[in-house]
Design a protein with these regions (language model features):
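PLP-dependent amino-acid enzyme catalytic core
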Residues: 1-128
Length: 128
């Protein structure tokens, strides 16, 4: 049994796939969608935030712009560590994505869709 959801990051199943009897070789699949946040970006978020904490660059809150999976990974890690997570994103992102981020405890600041990710990045810089 794991004591933290973070311990399951990266410990995803590996499947052996034989594409066809006519094709030699084997394809191996690592099912990164089985990470707790649903993507390989959980690994990136964990290692980046862990490094920032070890360097003393991150103490109690993080601010970042996101369009999705990396933000979900960051929100997951922050929730597990008790850090505040402020994310900026274009208002055009799906309601499901916004709900998932909020479910992990992230505070969202939505930026105008017309400004795209550039607008979200500028807002994150302003908040940081």
């Amino acid at each position: 049994m794991q004591s933290s959801v973070l311990q399951s990051i990266g410990k995803t199943p590996i499947l052996k796939l034989k594409l066809s009897k006519d094709l030699p070789g084997t394809v191996w699949l690592k099912l990164e969608n089985q990470n707790p946040g649903g993507s390989i970006k959980d690994r990136v978020a964990f290692h980046c935030l862990e490094r920032a904490v070890k360097r003393g660059e991150l103490r109690d809150r993080m601010v970042a712009a996101t369009s999705g999976n990396l933000g979900i990974g960051c929100a997951l890690v922050c929730a597990a560590w008790g850090l505040e997570c402020f994310l900026t994103m274009p208002e055009s992102m799906s309601d499901e994505r916004k709900a998932l981020l909020r479910g992990f405890g992230a505070q969202l600041r939505l930026t105008p869709a017309a400004a795209g990710m550039g607008g979200a990045v500028e807002e994150a810089k302003r908040l940081a």
